[in-house]
């Protein structure tokens, strides 16, 4: 008793960890038996106390933390600030997400710590506290949810939801919080189920691979070891953990004194001596060599000394112990346990939390600014990054502190700044250890409002989306969404016109209907058309073409902005350029009218190629009346035979295209002769490599036609016309109604009579239906699905025009002259197969006869019915029927002029008109023919027109550099049916204007429309100038990109911004009486050339102008590079004008000075009041779609005071983007936006929302694109730390064990193995190279793998002894593959054999065996053992047994599993002795070791000789353990 009283008494509660430590010390001191006795007493005491305490848990025991309220409030305040920064565009979405997660995570963690101390101080006996912190049940994070806050949760994809749950379970959750928290719960339930199974299977595989590893001998005699040294940055704790329980491989000396001998096991005492020695002489201490399972020389078992102490009782492991199975279970078991903790605390971004350096005292901080450069932190804050270790001094009042900041750290304060004590001054980049837990994640940012996209830097194409509309940002910059108000209603009349609003004045006052094509904005918007005219007049919109405006009324022109990036191009002289003036009707000059159906067409980006058509003239004389469908016949004056024959051959397949095109073509004929340029539709892809494709979102349809690269193309195409209208208006009809050429569905009819009409064949199922009222919609909709598959790459050569890269060119090669042509009426109906006809085949009917239930005929005549597989064709031929006596003498298909008698017919009478004679065969009779005589309308071609009659004189004076030619062509294929709907006209002949030039080196001509307004006159000019383009462009299938020329290899943003460059000029409605002409314009108005530096505009002055003889000269005061020339509208007053382009120059504020020549100042008085200019941030012209309305409430007015104006001259310019809260003048800017009106005393902002985007972010869409709310705007790719709960950890462990490729492991390891395999044999030669190379490779990879696995478990707080992992890794890496380099007599190439076996075989045979190290996974290693019974019981039973039988394998039953399967005694424990026979070899062990030492010394010499090479080529002599946690260095002491 007296003795006991002297013992120290500790009055202190202990937790689970303390008990663990106590037990291990008890075992060390007293051994197993006595310890178990003590623990029994503790157990009894525990149960007794628990019973008497009788813990109960009620809701009142859940005490919330008092400080929670203000902590949460503080976090909310920070979040609010963050939102504001985001709104101002100061941080981008990822930075915002990161910071918000970290703010809430820190709050949550702080609360967790508070909770612990709060319980301890206020209520230490609280049952919640007792339970959770005793380690009995529940853990801190679960209690934290009960009484702290739940914090951030992950969604089912593992992404953070950045809305934290602020309540705890005691307070109760709101509905939103409840739903968010259910995510985690669901994920937890699923994970627990799935992962438990995974973990169990992992354990099974691990045990499988090492079940035969048993301790069978005391010593294997190895002399290899692995060196451990605390010098390599290893922590003391790890050093101790690594050494305790191991066996030394070599003697250890301190100075000359040996303090530990070889084969001695290391206990805590020895380790402490090592540590003391290292501390005393850190640089002289030698590394400690230990034995590990890796160095054991046995193949299928392990020796006591290589294994070391048994973890259970602290002595050397006993013989006969199944250490393999223990290892497998030790690794697998934590996995099974950890899957039950799948609770997500959600610290997603915390894996890379940085260490902070704080200021030691108040004072002024100083550092060398040359050694740092500015950067952004992960949270978007400004900081300095230091290149090298930086020395920072903090000067307080009486003391100078100096702080060292390691390299690559971020300094968060400025030089000479005053810092307070404990203020964070720097952030150390988190160590490389977190590297492997990073993953790349995409974050999509969606637009928060409708608007127009602008960006403030150049962009380039994402290489993998070369042909898409995705772009990459080369530097951090802002994207702006400029607010617009979409006008989607077609008849909405806006009464929003107020003073100083920008409106398209005439757009909404015109009667008629406007259909805006929003395909520019996004293809997903479904467009609804408001139908004002009823079914008949339904418009069909083609959604694939870019910005097109269709109207039945008149429309204001809109203008392309075609500017080069380098203004020098504009500054050339007048040569290579001409200007075409467009004329207004004088009374209605607000409407632009092109009389006589002249249509101008400027191709995409305004670039014309040689021989391009740029204007059409539809002569009313060649317009067909509304009589209906029919056939056009004509003769060529020079008709080459080869064309003729091939044309016959193709005629049948041409039929469907033609008719369908014709049928649509006239639907808009009265209202509109101008359609979108078809150059989108036909594209050649001639020189693919040569053309850079940079177009953006104009999707091309060039794939709708088949390309035939031979010279003639499809010959039928030569005879086709440049029929633009129907295709443009209705989408390309070839796409919708196309024949399926590849599918063999053509029958070429042999009947002579059918051949004559080029009848449509089977392929045309729904390709063209007549557009009667009933089938009109069907034919458009149904056929689209069936024939929507476009064919690639087509080139169309129509009637001598070659489609070349999107513009139509005139080719002399195929030009033919036609003197007259004829139109013959005929009707065709395509009816569904099932329809019941009311007329018979070969019957003769009158006009308006009922054909089917709801179809009536429009012509009278002969009916022919032809039934096809899928439909019925019904043709009606008008005309008289004759039965001639000598049918053979009649030439079918001939045209007979008037006044000629027809002798063969029964009657003979004079004809006033031409007739067309056809021969028809009577059915079921081979000889009998009848003749159909059909009336024909003749049209003569007029050769009288020439340039002089159509174009003004001063245009012709340009001919020295650009030539214009007129060409007539016929719009229809010879003898092809033109199907019509009946309330429209059809144009037979078109006259087109072709532009050409001589200079070979010029690539193309650029065309642009210029509109110039003065007080009472608005004039428009088409300007064409020759340009030598750097890169021509073509389009490709599904090409959504569009950027024009790229001068100097960078994007030209004016081009991306330009409209679909095409003037809309409506034809005159028939009832208007005034006829002016675009071509011969009224000579009353003198024209005046104003030659600015760009020398490109012509301005028609108003009547009786005072300045008829204005000077033609440049103003020398304007620097050439600083002016864009007069490319805009000079607006008389702001109250009414259209959104076209406005005047601008580079010297923004000086708008009213120096702009024009002095003597023009009076004329342009309007400049004094110039209110509007539109430019983008880089001072390029910006433009609006005609469908954007700027509403008044989007504009913010800011008034400048005169005193502040002078200072801000440098700051404000038009088009500049300004962020909210910027302090420009005395007041702050209240809203972000773009300046687009600058007055003397105020400016107007157009509201805009900035989004910050980082380098490499992907921008969706193109400059100037219209976005809708919710459209995807930018995609960021950022790295985040994986939330390293075991749900991610376990799969990773499994991947490493399976040697499967994972992000960070395999590239390094595989590369390293390759390097070793290659370099070592090269250095050392054969056979040493292979032997040593394979060994070093295996050693490297083993240690690397052990590290990676340990890292995953340690991150979870799980301690597993290295030796367990080593035993498994040893099995995974113990095989080599025999290579094909040297054929050996022993092994087959590709065979897997053990490394030791290969070495022994090589030594025994005295010949070199070539092999390479290989990394097997645990599954493959389990299937490559010495026991086929073990393999078969694992996987693929039948295959394994069959192979074993074929090979005649013998199983020696050395492992546990084989014996269990066969019911024998297992060779461990008590059954061990039966299997181990003392071999006579053991007596000779000493001599063996002697011999081996001889062999080893040779190898050692070789290694030392090549030390430098080895170490420079690899990481071997460097940090063996790769990471800072466990550095090992393998040295082979041989």
From Swiss-Prot:
Name used for this protein in its record: DNA-directed RNA polymerase subunit beta''
Q: Which cysteines are joined by disulfide bonds?
A: none
> What are its cofactors?
Zn(2+)
NCBIfam families, per database record: rpoC2_cyan
**Family that this chain belongs to:** Belongs to the RNA polymerase beta' chain family. RpoC2 subfamily.
Q: What broad class of enzyme is this?
A: transferase
Which InterPro entries does the record match to this protein?
A: DNA-dir_RpoC2_beta_pp (IPR012756), RNA_pol_beta''_euk (IPR050254), RNA_pol_Rpb1_3_sf (IPR042102), RNA_pol_Rpb1_4 (IPR007083), RNA_pol_Rpb1_5 (IPR007081), Rpb1_funnel_sf (IPR038120)
EC no. given is 2.7.7.6
For this protein, the record's Gene3D superfamilies field holds: 1.10.132.30, 1.10.150.390, 1.10.1790.20, RNA polymerase Rpb1, domain 3
Annotated region Disordered: the residues are: 644-698, 719-800
Q: How is the cofactor bound?
A: Binds 1 Zn(2+) ion per subunit.
How this chain assembles, per its entry, is:
In plastids the minimal PEP RNA polymerase catalytic core is composed of four subunits: alpha, beta, beta', and beta''. When a (nuclear-encoded) sigma factor is associated with the core the holoenzyme is formed, which can initiate transcription.
Gene that produces this protein: rpoC2
User: Ranges of Acidic residues compositional bias?
Assistant: 744-762, 770-789
Which residues are listed for Zn(2+) binding in this entry?
220, 296, 303, 306
Give the source species.
Saccharum hybrid
Which residues are in coiled coils? Answer: none
Q: What is its main location?
A: plastid
**What do the Gene Ontology cellular component annotations say?**
chloroplast; DNA-directed RNA polymerase complex; mitochondrion
SUPFAM superfamilies the record matches: beta and beta-prime subunits of DNA dependent RNA-polymerase
- Protein's UniProt keywords contain DNA repair: no
**What functional role does this protein have?**
DNA-dependent RNA polymerase catalyzes the transcription of DNA into RNA using the four ribonucleoside triphosphates as substrates.
Question: Which residues fall in a compositionally biased region of kind Basic and acidic residues?
Answer: 644-668, 678-688
Q: Where in the cell is it found?
A: Plastid, Chloroplast
Has UniProt tagged this entry with the keyword rRNA-binding? no
What is the catalytic activity of this protein?
A: RNA(n) + a ribonucleoside 5'-triphosphate = RNA(n+1) + diphosphate
Gene Ontology molecular-function annotations: DNA binding; DNA-directed RNA polymerase activity; zinc ion binding
Q: Name one GO biological process term.
A: DNA-templated transcription
């Amino acid at each position: 008793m007296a003795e006991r009283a002297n013992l120290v008494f500790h009055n202190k509660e202990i937790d689970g960890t303390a008990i663990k430590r106590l037990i291990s010390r008890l075992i060390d001191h007293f051994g197993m038996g006595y310890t178990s006795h003590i623990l029994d007493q503790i157990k009894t005491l525990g149960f007794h106390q628990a019973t008497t305490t009788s813990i109960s848990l009620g809701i009142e025991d859940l005490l919330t933390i008092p400080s929670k309220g203000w902590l949460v409030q503080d976090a909310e305040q920070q979040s609010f600030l963050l939102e504001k920064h985001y709104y101002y565009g100061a941080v981008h979405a990822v930075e915002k997400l990161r910071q918000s997660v970290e703010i809430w995570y820190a709050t949550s963690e702080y609360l967790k710590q508070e909770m612990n101390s709060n319980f301890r101080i206020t209520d230490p006996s609280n049952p919640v506290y007792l339970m959770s912190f005793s380690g009995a049940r529940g853990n801190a994070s679960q209690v934290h949810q009960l009484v702290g806050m739940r914090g951030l949760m992950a969604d089912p994809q593992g992404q953070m939801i950045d809305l934290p749950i602020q309540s705890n379970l005691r307070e109760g959750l709101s509905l939103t919080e409840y739903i968010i928290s259910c995510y985690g719960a669901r994920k937890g339930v699923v994970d627990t189920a799935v992962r438990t199974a995974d973990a169990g299977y992992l354990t099974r595989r691990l045990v499988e691979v090492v079940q035969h590893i048993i301790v069978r001998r005391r010593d294997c005699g190895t002399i290899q070891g692995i060196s451990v040294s605390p010098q390599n940055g290893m922590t003391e704790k790890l050093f101790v953990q690594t050494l305790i329980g191991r066996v030394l491989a070599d003697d250890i000396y301190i100075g000359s004194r040996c303090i530990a001998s070889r084969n001695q096991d290391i206990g805590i005492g020895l380790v402490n001596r090592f540590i003391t020695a290292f501390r005393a002489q850190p640089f002289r201490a030698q590394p400690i060599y230990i034995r590990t399972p890796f160095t054991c020389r046995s193949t299928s078992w392990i020796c006591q000394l290589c294994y070391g102490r048994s973890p259970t009782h602290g002595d050397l492991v006993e013989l006969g112990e199944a250490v393999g199975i223990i290892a497998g279970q030790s690794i697998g078991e934590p996995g099974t346990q950890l899957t039950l903790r799948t609770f997500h605390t959600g610290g997603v971004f915390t894996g890379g939390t940085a260490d902070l350096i704080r200021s030691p005292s108040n004072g002024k901080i100083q550092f060398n600014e040359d050694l740092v450069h500015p950067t952004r932190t992960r949270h978007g804050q400004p900081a300095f990054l230091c290149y090298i270790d930086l020395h920072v001094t903090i000067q307080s009042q009486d003391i100078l502190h100096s702080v060292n900041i390691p390299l690559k750290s971020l300094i968060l304060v400025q030089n000479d700044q005053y810092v307070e004590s404990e203020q964070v001054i720097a952030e150390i980049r988190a160590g490389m250890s977190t590297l492997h837990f990073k993953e790349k994640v995409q974050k999509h940012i969606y637009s928060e409002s409708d608007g127009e996209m602008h960006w403030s830097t150049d962009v380039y194409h994402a290489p993998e989306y070369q042909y898409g509309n995705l772009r990459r940002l080369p530097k951090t910059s802002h994207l702006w969404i400029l607010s617009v108000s979409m006008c989607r209603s077609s008849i909405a009349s806006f009464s929003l016109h107020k003073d100083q609003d920008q409106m398209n004045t005439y757009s909404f006052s015109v009667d008629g209907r406007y259909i805006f094509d929003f395909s520019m904005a996004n293809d997903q918007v479904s467009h609804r058309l408001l139908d004002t005219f009823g079914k008949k007049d339904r418009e069909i919109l083609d959604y694939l073409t870019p910005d097109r405006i269709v109207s039945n009324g008149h429309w204001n022109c809109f203008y392309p902005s075609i500017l080069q990036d380098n203004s020098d191009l504009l500054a050339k002289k007048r040569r290579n350029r001409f200007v075409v003036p467009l004329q207004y009707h004088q009374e209605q000059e607000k409407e632009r009218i092109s009389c006589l159906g002249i249509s101008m067409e400027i191709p995409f980006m305004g670039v014309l190629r040689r021989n391009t058509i740029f204007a059409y003239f539809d002569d009313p004389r060649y317009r067909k009346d509304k009589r209906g469908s029919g056939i056009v016949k004509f003769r060529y004056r020079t008709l080459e035979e080869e064309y003729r024959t091939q044309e016959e051959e193709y005629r049948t397949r041409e039929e469907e295209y033609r008719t369908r095109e014709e049928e649509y073509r006239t639907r808009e004929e009265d209202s509109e002769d101008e359609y979108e340029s078809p150059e989108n539709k036909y594209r050649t892809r001639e020189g693919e490599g040569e053309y850079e494709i940079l177009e953006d979102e104009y999707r091309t349809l060039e794939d709708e036609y088949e390309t035939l690269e031979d010279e003639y193309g499809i010959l039928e195409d030569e005879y086709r016309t440049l029929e633009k209208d129907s295709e443009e208006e209705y989408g390309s009809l070839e796409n919708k109604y196309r024949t399926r050429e590849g599918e063999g569905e053509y029958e070429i009819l042999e009947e002579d009579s059918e051949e004559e009409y080029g009848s449509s064949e089977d392929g045309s199922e729904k390709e063209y239906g007549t557009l009667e009222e009933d089938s009109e919609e069907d034919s458009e909709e149904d056929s689209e699905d069936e024939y929507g598959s476009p064919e690639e790459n087509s080139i169309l050569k129509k009637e001598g025009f070659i489609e070349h890269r999107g513009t139509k060119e005139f080719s002399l090669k195929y030009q033919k002259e036609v003197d007259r042509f004829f139109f013959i009426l005929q009707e065709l109906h395509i009816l569904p197969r099932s329809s019941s006809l009311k007329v018979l085949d070969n019957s003769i009917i009158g006009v308006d006869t009922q054909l089917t239930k709801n179809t009536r005929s429009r012509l009278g005549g002969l009916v022919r019915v032809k039934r096809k597989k899928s439909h019925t064709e019904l043709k009606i031929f008008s005309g008289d029927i004759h039965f001639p006596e000598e049918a053979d003498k009649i030439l079918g298909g001939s045209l007979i002029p008037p006044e000629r008698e027809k002798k063969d017919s029964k009657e003979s009478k004079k004809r006033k008109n031409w007739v067309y004679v056809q021969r028809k065969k009577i059915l079921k009779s081979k000889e009998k023919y009848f003749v159909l005589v059909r009336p024909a309308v003749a049209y003569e071609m007029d050769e009288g027109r020439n340039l002089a009659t159509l174009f003004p004189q001063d245009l012709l004076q340009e001919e020295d550099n650009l030539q214009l030619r007129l060409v007539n062509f016929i719009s229809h294929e010879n003898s092809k049916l033109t199907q019509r709907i009946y309330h429209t006209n059809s144009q037979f002949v078109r006259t087109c204007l072709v532009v050409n030039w001589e200079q070979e080196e010029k690539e193309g001509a650029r065309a642009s429309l210029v509109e110039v307004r003065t007080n009472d006159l608005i004039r428009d000019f088409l300007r064409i100038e020759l340009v030598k383009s750097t890169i021509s462009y073509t389009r490709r299938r599904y090409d959504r990109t569009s950027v024009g020329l790229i001068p100097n290899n960078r994007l030209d943003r004016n081009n991306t911004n330009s409209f679909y460059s095409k003037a809309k000029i409506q034809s005159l409605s028939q009832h208007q009486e005034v006829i002016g002409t675009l071509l011969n314009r009224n000579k009353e108005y003198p024209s005046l050339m104003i030659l600015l530096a760009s020398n490109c505009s012509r301005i028609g002055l108003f009547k009786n102008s005072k300045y008829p003889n204005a000077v033609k000269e440049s103003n020398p005061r304007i620097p050439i590079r600083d002016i864009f020339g007069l490319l805009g509208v000079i607006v008389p007053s702001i109250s009414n004008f259209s959104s076209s382009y406005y005047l601008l120059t580079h010297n923004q504020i000086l708008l009213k000075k120096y702009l024009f020549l002095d003597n023009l100042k009076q004329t342009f008085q309007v400049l004094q009041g110039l209110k509007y200019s539109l430019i983008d941030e880089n001072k390029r012209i910006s433009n609006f779609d005609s469908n954007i309305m700027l509403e008044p409430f989007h504009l913010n007015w800011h008034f400048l005071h005169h005193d502040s104006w002078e200072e801000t001259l440098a700051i404000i310019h038009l088009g500049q983007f300004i962020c909210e809260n910027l302090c420009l003048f005395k007041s702050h800017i209240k809203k972000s936006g773009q300046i687009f009106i600058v007055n003397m005393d105020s400016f107007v902002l157009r509201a805009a929302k900035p989004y910050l985007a980082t380098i490499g972010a992907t921008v969706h869409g193109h400059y100037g694109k219209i976005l809708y709310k919710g459209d995807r705007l930018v995609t960021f790719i950022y790295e985040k730390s994986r939330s390293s709960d075991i749900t991610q950890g376990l799969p990773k462990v499994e991947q490493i064990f399976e040697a499967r490729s994972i992000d960070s492991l395999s590239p390094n390891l595989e590369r390293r193995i390759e390097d070793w395999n290659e370099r070592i044999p090269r250095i050392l030669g054969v056979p040493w190279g292979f032997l040593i190379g394979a060994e070093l490779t295996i050693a490297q990879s083993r240690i690397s793998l052990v590290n990676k696995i340990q890292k995953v478990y340690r991150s979870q707080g799980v301690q597993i002894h290295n030796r367990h992992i080593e035993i498994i890794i040893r099995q995974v890496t113990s095989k080599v593959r025999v290579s094909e380099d040297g054929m050996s007599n022993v092994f087959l190439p590709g065979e897997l054999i053990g490394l030791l076996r290969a070495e022994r075989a090589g030594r025994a045979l005295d010949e070199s065996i070539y092999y390479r190290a290989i990394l097997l996974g645990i599954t493959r290693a389990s299937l490559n053992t010495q026991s086929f019974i073990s393999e078969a019981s694992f996987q693929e039973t039948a295959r394994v047994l069959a192979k074993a039988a074929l090979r005649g394998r013998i199983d020696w039953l050395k492992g546990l599993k084989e014996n269990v399967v066969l019911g024998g005694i297992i060779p461990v424990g008590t059954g061990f002795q039966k299997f181990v026979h003392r071999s006579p070899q053991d007596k000779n062990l000493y001599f063996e070791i002697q011999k081996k030492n001889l062999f080893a010394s040779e190898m050692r010499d070789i290694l030392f000789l090549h030390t430098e090479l080895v170490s420079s080529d690899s990481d071997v002599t460097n940090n063996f353990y790769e990471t800072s946690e466990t550095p090992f260095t393998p040295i082979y002491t041989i």
